[in-house]
Design a protein with these regions (language model features):
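General beta-strand structural signal in soluble alpha/beta enzymes
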Residues: 41-44, 92-93, 123
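Flavin-dependent oxidoreductases
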Residues: 100-170
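Dinucleotide-binding Rossmann-like beta1-alpha1 core, especially the glycine-rich loop
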Residues: 1-51
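A short, glycine/Asx- and small/polar-enriched loop/turn
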Residues: 20, 51-60, 101-108
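Short aromatic/hydrophobic contact patches that present stacked aromatics
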Residues: 12-16, 62-64, 150
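Helical element adjacent to the flavin cofactor pocket in flavoenzyme catalytic cores
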Residues: 63-120
Length: 170
């Protein structure tokens, strides 16, 4: 089945509030170019205000990504789970994975509730994804969780900005 969830390509802005943050914005721009993100550009204060009149007066620049878009994460996850279920995926909730090993024609997964063999494993462990990665890869990684805030507004308040707006990380 086809995944059925709404997607809106509205572009995104990473906003810089202080001139001394410009090197961070420029580094983010360069990383985006290296990663092949099309159409990236840095907007000055005037260009940003023209694009988003309600943006903070403190905003001095922004990285604009016209290909950015938004989905409802709840609807997306439900659509993916329904699609996976329709394609025969088995779900094992409240089950801790203790070991993951490659075997002939797939993987052996040892868990708190038994051992399973499968052809494919999807690592969807969020901030714990590094633990699964490190079970099977010689190149070890570490995920450092970050906190952020998303503001969910009433639909009647949804016209204050037209792009997805992020603060410059750091």
């Amino acid at each position: 089945p086809i995944l059925d969830f709404p997607f809106k390509r509205n572009g995104s802005l990473v906003v810089c509030l202080h001139e001394d943050e410009m090197p961070g914005l420029e580094a983010l721009y360069k990383r985006g170019i290296t990663n092949g993100v099309p159409g990236l550009r840095i907007l000055n204060r005037e260009e940003l205000r023209a694009m988003e009149p309600n943006i903070s007066d403190e905003a001095c620049a922004a990285l604009y990504a016209p290909t950015g878009g938004i989905v409802c994460p709840f609807n997306l996850n439900i659509a993916m789970a329904e699609n996976a279920n329709a394609n025969g995926v088995e779900f094992h909730f409240n089950t801790e994975v203790t070991d993951l090993r490659p075997v002939e024609d797939g993987w052996e997964i040892r868990t708190s509730k038994g051992t399973y063999k499968t052809r494919y494993v999807v690592n969807a462990a969020g901030v714990y994804a590094d633990k699964f990665h490190n079970m099977v890869s010689n190149k070890k990684i570490h995920i450092t969780p970050r906190r952020g805030d998303y503001c969910l507004l009433d639909k009647t308040a949804g016209n204050h900005v037209s792009h997805t707006v992020f603060a410059l990380p750091g």
